[in-house]
Amino acid sequence: MTLPDGSEVSGPWDIRGRFDEYIGHYPLRGKTVLDVGTATGFLAFEAEKRGAIVTATDAHSAIDMKSLPFQTSLHFANKAAWLAAMDPWLITLKNSFWFGWHEYKSKADVLYAPIDRLTLWDRKFDVVIAGAIVEHLSDPITAIGVFASLAKEAVIIGFTPVSANEGLILETATPWSSPEPEFSYTWWAVSRGLYKRIFANMGFDVEFVECEAICNGVPERRPTIIARRISPL
């Protein structure tokens, strides 16, 4: 992330200069946008730069997060200790968002809540953006349904592993063989066919486009899913 004063904040992923491709060049000016899983806020701030009226949301606490099951995993062996370790990390992530929020003079609203509770919220948005989070959800199907229920116009699931299968398939996104933290939060690759079915059920048509991001200095390409509403709310 490059801040307004020219200073840079580094991280493993870099999509600077690629945001428009990342969201499939979807127009955002004048639209209300919900950024789900905002993390450091990069997508929210980029959407604001393009004239969107943004609300950002993320996990309230680590209790909202799930880990792959392993006997040696602290998440399963001692959940209280796992929460005590993870909540400070989540606070650091939130602090980085608020630092950027002040530096960019952002006007984005923020809500911290589990994804499945967003449907209790009496708000709808023109566009819902979920950037590279679906593979990190143990229940991506319900989450996609939530995104769709909140979107008046479009859902954009950015830079996300997609199985090429046209059947109604959930494939594991990794071998599920390592309890190491960097691997234990990656769950599923939803198939093209299953994306189409879920969104059709919710009144959307689906397009898959390719986009690029830099991971630890190496370019990587993945699909972005653009679902456009064809059945009005």
Where are these regions (language model features)?
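A short glycine-rich, Lys/Arg-flanked "PGG" loop and its adjoining helix->strand segment in the class I
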Residues: 141-154
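Conserved class I S-adenosyl-L-methionine
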Residues: 31-39, 156-179
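A short SAM/SAH-binding and catalytic strip from SAM-dependent methyltransferases
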Residues: 127-138
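A short acidic, Gly/Pro-enriched loop at the edge of an enzyme's catalytic core
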Residues: 119-128
